[in-house]
Structures are given as C-alpha cells and as structure tokens.
C-alpha cells in the first residue's frame, strides 16, 4: 500500500488505537496531543505515596485491547499485567443493606444475605434477555461498525431490528420487567455509568453493558489503568507511529468538503490524506473548523453532552475494612438522582457515588495503613450559567456527609491529601464538550442511544473516534471505535485502488 499520510488529533484510547491499526496497515501515521501523556482521560496522579487513576478505573472486554497486539503477532501480557476481580463491586444502600456483585451467580447468592433464590433466578432470566441483545448488536453494530438506525435496518431488516434491540423500551423498563427487588433494579440500572447517562432515558439496547461485564469479567490493570495506555503507546512506537506530545492542533485546513491538513500551535502546517480526530465531534467542528453557533446548537439538540463528575481524590490515613476495590453508595431515590442530573441540571441532593479503592487489590497504591479513595458522583455538564465555587463547596460537604453516614466514619478527620476536579478542569485538560466525561448522552428520545457517526457528514476524509461517536463511551468501546475507523479508511483505500484499475 502507498504511504498515505494520516494525522491523528489526540492520543486518547480511540486515537492511539486508530494510530496502531492504521500503522499496521502500512499508513504513515502522526499523532499530536496537546498534553504530555498518551491515553487522554486515562491519566495519572502520584503524590505523597498515593496513586490515583484520574480517569477510568475499570477494565472490561480486554480482548479488544489484546487484538491490537495480536495484529502485530505480539501478546498484551508481555506489555502489561491485568487481573480478573471475582468480586466486581460492592453496593451500599441507605438502609444499611449491602449487595456484592459477582460474575458467578451461585457465589453471588451465597455471599449476599439480602438476596433470595428468586432474586438470583430473576437475575439469570434478565441476563438471558441481555445476552440476546448483546448477540444481536455484535453482528452489525460492533462487527461492521454500523453507525445509524437506517444502516442496521438495512442490514438486519425492520422487524428483526426492532425486536433485536427491544426498541420500544428504556433500559430501566427492561430491567424492571425481570427484577422485582428495588435495590437490584438500582444496581443494574447504574451500569449506565459507563456511558454517563440515565437508565430511565437510555434505550434498552444498553442492557448489553451488563451482559458484557458478566461474560467478559471485570479486570484491574496492575499498577493502575495508565499502564495500559503506556503499553499501547509502546506498541504504537514499535509500529512506526510518530507521536508528538505537548503539541496542539489549533485548526483544520479545508478545500471545499476536503481536509488538506492541520495547523499546529507553533504555526506550522502539516498536510494529510486523512484526519482522525480523537477530540469530541462538537469541539472539533466548533474550535477547529469554526462551525457557526447556530449549527453547533442544532447538533447539540440531538447529541447532548453526557454527564460530568465532581471527582475527589482522597488520601486517607485510615483503612476502611468494609470497602471493596469498586464500590457504589446509592442514592435513596435513584430516579430523583437521575432527574436532577439529566433533566433539572442541578447538583444532586443525594447523589449515587462511585468509590474506587484500588489499594484493596494493589497495596502499592497507598502507604501502609492508608488508602487511596477516588470519589465520583455524576453531575451535569457545564451549563450556560455555571455552578459557583460556593455551590461546588456545598456539594463537597454533601458528598462527605453521605460517605460518613454510610460507614466511612470520621472520614474528614482522616483526609491527609485531597485533589478535586470539576467539569471545568475536565474541559480545560481534555477539551471535552462542556466538561462531559463520557462524550454524548445515550437518550432514547434524542438519539435512540446512537452517538455521532465515525465518518464526518461534512468532509470526505475526516473521521472521529472516542466517546462522542459510535459505539460509545467506556474504555473498550472508544478503543473499538479506533479500530473501526481504521477499517473504514482501509476500505476506502481499497475502493480507490479498485476504481483506478477499472
């Protein structure tokens, strides 16, 4: 294959994945990232003996990452160590009940005094339902990288498509049809956290997230998630990708509906045959291609930002024995919590909190007798009238109050290190649209759960990867998006070659 030039804007997991696959296919690939690390939101904080994953903390579907190494006849295990966690996470509820989530249902029954045989049987039936949706989506959405409802209907047929994704149900409606216990409903509904959305608004097709985790397991990257990003960076370099960190792309140059190259922050121009943007779609169109405010507003009506977060990294000089590696402290009213975040657009009164304590699996992540707590409640993305510092401060107190009331006794007294990220920090560091963490919200009414297509509808050689495009947010999905974009570009090149011979 001729050495066509490809520029990757941004080195998140989608960008580095696309870079690797395109380099493996023989393209001349250059990747530019404004930050000084590869991995995007897979970022790292190490201080005073504590280690924190600043972004994602859970690895699922590791085979998607392993495939990148396999294409080069290499094995991921030679680059990074991952460990399967039998106890996937622990859920705490306001009445004192605790439910441990195991991938083995018999183990889950034996470990949870609050669950009955009927509960486990209902869960088994629900997982059978979710598996059918998972298998249906594997054939077109994942395997072929289909981007639109019309493409899926064309491939699968109308009636089969409607039935295959339980089209007329939301995720929570589907869960509630099978599960009677409210706490199990809340726990399963919060799998929607992977895409920063509401289970009451998201389509039922996203129940596949639950089956994926049960089938593929939940994994920990030894030493922290950033080790996986470092492994991918090493593979990219070995495949010949030219990686330029600390270099920002300021604009994209065009000729009618064709991209000719990019302008860097040092004023230089770099030409390319294809551009793959790992920046979110709307920031790319708004900031690099200077779309009008009216056009951006039209796009956001369909592709609204997903949730952001108020992220607290706490180093504490106490060990909390009741915590697992991954923990969820649930709101007393999950439906209200979703409504406040996704509809009222306010800081929730009683948030559901995700709490990571990787020290439970990896003692190197905190000094002896200490723990590294990452605390993440979802909050709205940046609004036209942003929250004030006082509002964030009040919210911090509510979060700490909830943690202490639900078992983290005297937490405030034991905090010896604290680092906080608001949506403004997320937007400034990663360039995400309005500080969203998960790209585009999955909403049955707005977009049927679909995100932007991976190929631009305005430019013939511009592609996108990451959480704002299909197949969606979360580490494995954004990584898969990079591989799917590489497949699309390869297909285009094959078509060009074939056409030129005719």
From Swiss-Prot:
Residues at which FAD binds: 8-20
Cofactors named for this entry: FAD
E.C. no: 1.14.99.-
GO biological process, one term: carotenoid biosynthetic process
Pfam annotation, one family: Amino_oxidase
Keyword match Oxidoreductase: yes
Catalytic activities: all-trans-4,4'-diaponeurosporene + 2 AH2 + 2 O2 = 4,4'-diaponeurosporenal + 2 A + 3 H2O
Coiled-coil region list: none
Sorted UniProt keywords: Carotenoid biosynthesis, FAD, Flavoprotein, Oxidoreductase, Virulence
Pathway assignment: Carotenoid biosynthesis; staphyloxanthin biosynthesis; staphyloxanthin from farnesyl diphosphate: step 3/5
KW Oxidoreductase (keyword) present: yes
Domain of life: Bacteria
InterPro entries, A to Z: Amino_oxidase, Carotenoid/retinoid_OxRdtase, FAD/NAD-bd_sf
GO molecular function, one term: oxidoreductase activity
PANTHER family: 4,4'-DIAPONEUROSPORENE OXYGENASE (PTHR43734:SF7), PHYTOENE DESATURASE (PTHR43734)
Similarity annotation: Belongs to the carotenoid/retinoid oxidoreductase family. CrtP subfamily.
Task of the protein: Involved in the biosynthesis of the yellow-orange carotenoid staphyloxanthin, which plays a role in the virulence via its protective function against oxidative stress. Catalyzes the oxidation of the terminal methyl side group of 4,4'-diaponeurosporene to form 4,4'-diaponeurosporen-4-al.
Identification of the protein by name: 4,4'-diaponeurosporene oxygenase
Organism expressing this protein natively: Staphylococcus haemolyticus (strain JCSC1435)
Phylogenetic lineage: Bacteria, Bacillati, Bacillota, Bacilli, Bacillales
Gene: crtP
């Amino acid at each position: 294959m001729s050495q066509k030039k490809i520029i990757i804007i941004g080195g998140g997991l989608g960008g580095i994945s696309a870079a690797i696959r395109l380099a493996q296919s023989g393209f001349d690939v250059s990747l530019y990232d404004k930050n000084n690390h590869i991995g995007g939101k897979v970022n790292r904080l190490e201080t005073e003996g504590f280690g924190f994953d600043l972004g994602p903390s859970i690895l699922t579907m590791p085979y998607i990452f392993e495939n990148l190494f396999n294409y080069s006849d290499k094995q991921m295990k030679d680059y990074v160590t991952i460990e399967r966690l039998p106890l996937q996470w622990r859920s705490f509820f306001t009445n004192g009940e605790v439910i441990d989530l195991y991938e083995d249902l018999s183990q889950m029954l034996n470990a949870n005094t609050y669950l009955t045989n009927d509960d486990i049987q209902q869960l088994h039936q629900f997982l059978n339902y979710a598996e059918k949706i998972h298998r249906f989506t594997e054939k077109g959405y994942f395997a072929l990288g289909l981007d639109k409802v019309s493409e899926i209907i064309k491939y699968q047929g109308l009636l089969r498509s409607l039935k295959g994704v339980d089209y007329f149900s939301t995720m929570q409606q589907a869960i509630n049809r099978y599960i009677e216990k409210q706490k199990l409903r809340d726990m399963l509904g919060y799998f929607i956290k992977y895409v920063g959305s509401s289970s009451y608004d998201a389509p039922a097709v996203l129940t596949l997230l639950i089956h994926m985790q049960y089938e593929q397991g939940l994994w920990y990257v030894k030493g922290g998630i950033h080790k996986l990003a470092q492994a991918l960076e090493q593979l990219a370099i070995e495949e010949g990708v030219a990686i330029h960190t600390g270099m920002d792309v300021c604009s994209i140059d065009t000729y009618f509906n064709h991209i000719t190259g990019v302008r860097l922050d040092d004023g230089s121009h770099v030409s390319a045959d294809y551009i793959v943007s790992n920046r979110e779609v709307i920031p790319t169109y708004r900031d690099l291609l200077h779309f009008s405010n009216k056009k951006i507003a039209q796009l956001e009506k369909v592709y609204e930002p997903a949730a952001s977060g108020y992220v607290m990294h706490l180093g504490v000089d106490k060990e909390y024995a009741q915590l697992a590696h991954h923990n969820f402290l649930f709101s007393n009213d999950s439906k209200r919590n979703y409504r406040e975040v996704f509809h009222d657009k306010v800081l929730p009164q009683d948030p559901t909190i995700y709490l990571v304590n990787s020290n439970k699996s990896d003692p190197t992540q905190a000094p002896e007798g200490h723990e590294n707590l990452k605390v993440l409640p979802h909050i709205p993305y940046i609004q036209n009238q942003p929250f004030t510092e006082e509002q964030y401060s009040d919210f911090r107190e509510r979060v700490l109050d909830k943690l202490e009331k639900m078992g983290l006794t005297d937490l405030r007294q034991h905090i010896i290190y604290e680092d906080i990220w608001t949506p403004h920090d997320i937007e400034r560091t990663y360039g995400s649209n309005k500080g969203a963490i998960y790209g585009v919200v999955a909403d049955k009414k707005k977009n049927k759960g679909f995100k932007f297509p991976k190929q631009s509808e305005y430019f013939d050689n511009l592609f996108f990867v990451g959480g704002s495009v299909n197949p969606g947010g979360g580490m494995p999905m954004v990584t898969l998006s990079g591989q799917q974009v590489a497949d699309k570009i390869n297909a285009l090149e094959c078509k060009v070659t074939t056409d030129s011979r005719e």
